[in-house]
């Protein structure tokens, strides 16, 4: 009798087990559909949703970081070359989170040593005139010793790069950066810190690094509230030959 009941119950048990088995459709997500972005035709070329900050033609997207007058660096032969006497320049637009691509070249005949050799910087958020903000260091890193938290690829005086991927002076180099801006409470206190991931010549040098605040030449970093900021390029005061930039674009992120 018991055996017969077991035989009769078996199909019911199997049916229940099959009903309880997860289905692949239960974990499929169909909405929202990501926007279509057309990649650039070549590596480093701006995708279809990029804001081109320098295309080799003019400085329309840039202003003086000191007084917000039109930028006065040198545009020639498709390049944007630092005019050191005119100071730093920054974007007219302000950004929060973004993906940035920038290419730069230190002259082949560069002179100087250490911090005085091909020095510049990409400030991922400019918080005032001069060097106020959050700097990703630009410097000749090819056989040019300096303090390692100020070498090329560093978050200046906060984070040593994972590796030195520098090319020789005279060769074009690139940064690809993902910037997550800090968020502040209504009273100006920090809610969430800034983070940066950076690739230097295609090599990871900063991996989701949490910044301690603004980058400073002297003193300890600190946060000062802001809501959106320009991207700034540095005209460093060293005496070495000026460097050039090209192909600068940004993609705003959520």
Describe the predicted segments one by one.
Residues 12-254:
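Carbohydrate-interacting regions of secretory-pathway proteins
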Residues 2-9:
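Bacterial N-terminal signal peptides
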């Amino acid at each position: 009798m018991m055996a017969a009941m077991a035989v009769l119950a078996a199909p019911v048990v199997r049916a229940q087990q099959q009903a309880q088995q997860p289905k692949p459709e239960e974990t499929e997500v169909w909405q929202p559909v990501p926007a279509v972005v057309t990649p650039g035709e070549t590596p480093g070329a701006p995708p279809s949703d990029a804001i081109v900050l320098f295309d080799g033609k003019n400085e329309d997207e840039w202003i003086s970081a000191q007084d917000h007058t039109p930028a006065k660096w040198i545009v020639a032969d498709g390049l944007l070359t630092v005019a050191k006497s005119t100071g730093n320049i920054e974007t007219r637009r302000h950004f929060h989170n973004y993906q940035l691509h920038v290419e730069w070249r230190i002259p082949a005949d560069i002179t100087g040593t250490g911090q005085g050799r091909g020095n510049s910087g990409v400030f991922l958020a400019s918080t005032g005139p001069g060097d106020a903000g959050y700097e990703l260091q630009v410097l000749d890193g090819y056989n040019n010793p300096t303090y390692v938290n100020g070498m090329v690829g560093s978050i200046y005086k906060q984070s040593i790069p994972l590796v030195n991927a520098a090319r020789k002076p005279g060769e074009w180099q690139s940064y690809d950066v993902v910037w997550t801006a800090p968020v502040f409470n209504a009273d100006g206190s920090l809610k969430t810190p800034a983070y940066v991931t950076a690739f230097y010549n295609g090599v990871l040098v900063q991996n989701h690094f949490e910044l301690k605040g603004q980058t400073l030449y002297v003193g300890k970093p600190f946060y000062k509230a802001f809501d959106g900021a320009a991207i700034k390029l540095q005209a460093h005061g060293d005496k070495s030959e000026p460097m050039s930039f090209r192909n600068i674009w940004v993609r705003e992120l959520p």
